[in-house]
A protein has these predicted regions:
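C-terminal helix-coil-helix/basic helical segment that borders enzyme active sites and/or dimer interfaces
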Residues: 177-191, 204-237, 250-258
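Extended, low-aromatic, Leu/Ala- and acidic/polar-enriched alpha-helical coiled-coil segments
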Residues: 156, 163, 194-204, 232-235, ...
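Alpha-helix capping/hinge segments and adjacent helical runs
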Residues: 225, 232-312
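FAD-binding core of flavoproteins
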Residues: 13-15, 19-174, 178, 188, ...
């Protein structure tokens, strides 16, 4: 979210909003998702109308992460309903608290919350926006640019999620290795059993593939190359990879892994969200498949849709 402000904010917006964020003085949230729209961002119904020198925003938002602790919100709303589909939306910088931006509730999920976690990162909030007045100069990135900015932000968010998933998977495998080298059953270490080694080898292969995917995408991002196809493929792979590795680590720990004596059980419930956030698996797979067909029809090969253009 801060990267969006860095890349699209005016000098004044960066001074007023980005600088205190970078200094750790304030926190920010992103209010895009709506109940009725879900993964279809173009289905959003929150509207913003220009009234003199202010925009007036009305609507509802859903699963706005960290809204309960935020001092600033990026709010996406429909400003141009008659424009082409992807040019109907704009993004606004909102200073919080504001009576027009109210948290209805913090949404309970399958991942248990801790007091420290709520204090540091807040929760996922349901928001009602009623006659929220925003100064005209708080429009971010230009009118009609909200959708494209949002997709750009999500692309980098998927990269960050992927890094987190690799780190968690690596740590889970570390915990599993630490357990199997000490645990003995029937007079033999678990680490010396062929089946256990196969399980750990499979995890290592998945982590290795995930790392290479991330490095390739990061390279393309640094070079300003189009990374949408690879990012979609990797998003699905990494979300399922971390689930598989953590699940294997739990299995290798036995009942201990199912308990809260290790962090594995907590991680397991938390990572289920990875197959939903920033686009569910099915949407990414659908788009990936469409791009494969498009590549073949254009080039006579699917290579460009499968990471074939590794470096340019």
């Amino acid at each position: 979210t801060m990267l969006t402000l860095l890349e699209h904010g005016t000098d004044d917006q960066k001074e007023r909003f980005l600088k205190p964020l970078l200094n750790g003085e304030k926190r920010i949230c992103y209010s895009m998702t709506e109940k009725a729209a879900g993964a279809d961002a173009t289905g959003m119904q929150t509207k913003a109308e220009l009234d003199g020198d202010e925009w007036v925003i009305n609507g509802e938002k859903w699963f706005s992460s960290s809204a309960s602790v935020a001092d600033i919100a990026l709010v996406m709303a429909k400003t141009d309903p008659e424009a082409p589909r992807h040019e109907q939306y704009s993004t606004f910088l909102v200073e919080l608290p504001d009576p027009g931006y109210q948290i209805l509730r913090n949404i309970e999920t399958m991942q248990p919350h801790t007091d420290l976690g709520l204090k540091l990162g807040g929760s996922h909030s349901e928001i009602t926006i009623e006659n929220l007045r925003v100064p005209r100069e708080n429009l971010l990135g230009g009118r009609g640019q909200g959708f494209n900015m949002g997709q750009h932000r999500l692309a980098y968010g998927r990269l960050r999620h992927g890094m987190h998933n690799v780190a968690m998977a690596q740590r889970a495998l570390d915990l599993a290795a630490g357990h199997v080298v000490q645990r003995e059953t029937f007079g033999k270490r678990l680490a010396d059993r062929q089946g256990v080694r196969w399980m750990m080898a499979d995890c290592a292969a998945e982590i290795y593939k995930a790392r290479l995917m991330l490095l390739h995408i990061a390279y393309k991002a640094e070079k300003g190359m189009d990374l949408r196809q690879e990012n979609g493929i990797a998003k699905v792979f990494l979300a399922n990879m971390v689930h598989q590795v953590v699940d294997t680590a739990i299995q290798l720990h036995g009942a201990l892994g199912y308990s809260h004596d290790t962090p594995l059980a907590r991680w397991y419930t938390g990572i289920r969200s990875q197959r939903l956030v920033d686009g569910p698996d099915e949407v990414h797979r659908w788009r990936t498949g469409a791009n494969i067909i498009k590549a073949y029809e254009k080039h006579g090969t699917t290579a460009s849709a499968c990471g074939g253009e590794l470096f340019e």
